[in-house]
């Protein structure tokens, strides 16, 4: 099983977890209000809400000499479960548990030094991460009713990069193809931290994240991969 398949399998397992978490929320939301004497506390603009979200983004930050990347094909995707707690009509707090996959495609050009000077047909760094995030939400339409509305999120994310692969692909002189997925890399840091911002309305939002820590140990003096990612998010909940 190659690195991409392993990360996709982990993504699928987390999807099942998130799906059943969402179903548990749905059962509560589908109570017949005419028969229920206790007002619900769960909803987009009620006391609390749980829901699933998906995100997809691109590397947006500047690369460095010696570790140039291919923009457009260097991407990230993620899935998670979000818990939001309303403090006031304009302010909420929350946390998220998620799984992220990141893929940095390395440009093969003279001057490359990360992770070595060898030029290959294709080369990338694959990351599979479990994440936990905490955020502040500021709503811009306090009189919106039970509706998610327009919002700004500011938060921090801790990442445990438990799957990291250096992937190399080449074509041999006889035309056969060889691919190597190298793990147990001695130069990587497995714990990282990001800060992020989201601007959205209802189910859709745009986000940007900025990595605060180094992916590589300082002992190796490698140029860092880009720290900025940007993309969009889809939240799944009943309006």
Which residues does each PLM region occupy?
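Bacterial Sec-dependent N-terminal signal peptides
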Residues: 1-30, 236
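Residues that define the transmembrane beta-barrel architecture of outer-membrane proteins
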Residues: 46-50, 71-77, 126-132, 148, ...
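Surface-exposed strand-loop-strand hairpins of Gram-negative outer-membrane beta-barrel proteins
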Residues: 58-80, 216-218
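Predominantly the C-terminal beta-signal and adjacent terminal strand-loop region
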Residues: 183-239
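Sec-dependent signal peptide cleavage junction
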Residues: 20-51
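Residues on the lipid-exposed face of transmembrane beta-strands in outer-membrane beta-barrel proteins
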Residues: 79-85, 99, 132-140, 154-158, ...
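Extracellular/periplasm-exposed beta-strand and loop segments of Gram-negative cell-envelope proteins
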Residues: 64-72, 104-129, 161-173, 177-194
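Short loop/turn motifs that connect adjacent beta-strands in outer-membrane beta-barrel proteins
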Residues: 40-50, 86-93, 142-149, 239
